[in-house]
Amino acid sequence: MIEIKKAKPTSPGRRHVVSVKNTELHTGKPFKGLVEVKKSKAGRNNTGRITVRHQGGGHKQHYRIVDFKRNKDDITAKVERIEYDPNRSANIALVLYADGERRYIVAPKGLKKDMSVISGEKVDVAVGNCMPLRNIPLGTVIHNIEMKPKKGAQMIRSAGTFAQLVGKDNAYAIIRLRSGEMRRVLLDCRAVIGVVSNSEHNLKSLGKAGAKRWRGIRPTVRGVAMNPVDHPHGGGEGRTSGGRHPVTPWGIPTKGYKTRRNKRSNKLIVQKRK
């Protein structure tokens, strides 16, 4: 059961808090055999330089090893529990296969404890089941889509997202993404039936800066508040507008300027996003 709670304004930090509580989530620790130590990088690369700004601190986290390949075919898996995962917006499900192996999978919406899932070439079109795109009926809502066969899911993994299978053409399937983009994917690539869980994720409001810090996100300082050595908008006597069109700290135009590099997979885009 999903509960959306708005906090009472007992303090400035509580006034704007909106929390989403799922009473069906497991409240204990994660399964020990599928957890790894996650070292905090604080946005630094191997030379110690900051390559991603505004990262550092936050609560210590463990990485949950999630199965994105779903390559254990024709063996039924029973859902033991649905869990929170601090590393992604979606919830995850701990499943127990008939041969005794346990794995974490991204939980689709509607998947509950004691339900069963299965992956394979020809399995039922039911929520949580994984199969090649060639065996999925047109119009089906899908997620966790592979871009290359057997590489593992790379698209549609965030909370509440989904794509729709709209066509099949020779060796390719055509899928419509949430952005409106139409993309071709090989029919041998796998996908999971359904919508990704935790679709209420966007309704959350953290309410205060400290809640961001708990998540390892540091403050974002405006360029006009910096010195000229730190940003192209920096400096000036008194408050200024920056004196030029908005740019990044490295002088590249921002606010609508397209910076996406051409990729080899661009040729698979049938219709660009809106």
Curated annotation (Swiss-Prot):
Amino-acid biosynthesis found in the keyword field: no
Region of interest: Disordered: 224-274
A Gene Ontology BP annotation from the UniProt entry: cytoplasmic translation
GO molecular function, one term: rRNA binding
Keyword Protein biosynthesis appears in the UniProt entry: no
Matches recorded under InterPro entries: NA-bd_OB-fold, Rib_uL2_dom2, Ribosomal_uL2, Ribosomal_uL2_bac/org-type, Ribosomal_uL2_C, Ribosomal_uL2_CS, Ribosomal_uL2_dom3, Ribosomal_uL2_RNA-bd_dom
Keywords assigned: Ribonucleoprotein, Ribosomal protein, RNA-binding, rRNA-binding
GO cellular component: large ribosomal subunit
Compositional bias per record (Basic residues), positions renumbered to this chain: 257-274
Domain of life of the organism encoding this protein: Bacteria
Family: Belongs to the universal ribosomal protein uL2 family.
HAMAP family: Ribosomal_uL2_B (MF_01320_B)
Subunit structure, interactors included: Part of the 50S ribosomal subunit. Forms a bridge to the 30S subunit in the 70S ribosome.
Main function: One of the primary rRNA binding proteins. Required for association of the 30S and 50S subunits to form the 70S ribosome, for tRNA binding and peptide bond formation. It has been suggested to have peptidyltransferase activity; this is somewhat controversial. Makes several contacts with the 16S rRNA in the 70S ribosome.
Record's protein name: Large ribosomal subunit protein uL2
Species, as recorded: Francisella tularensis subsp. tularensis (strain SCHU S4 / Schu 4)
Gene that encodes the chain: rplB
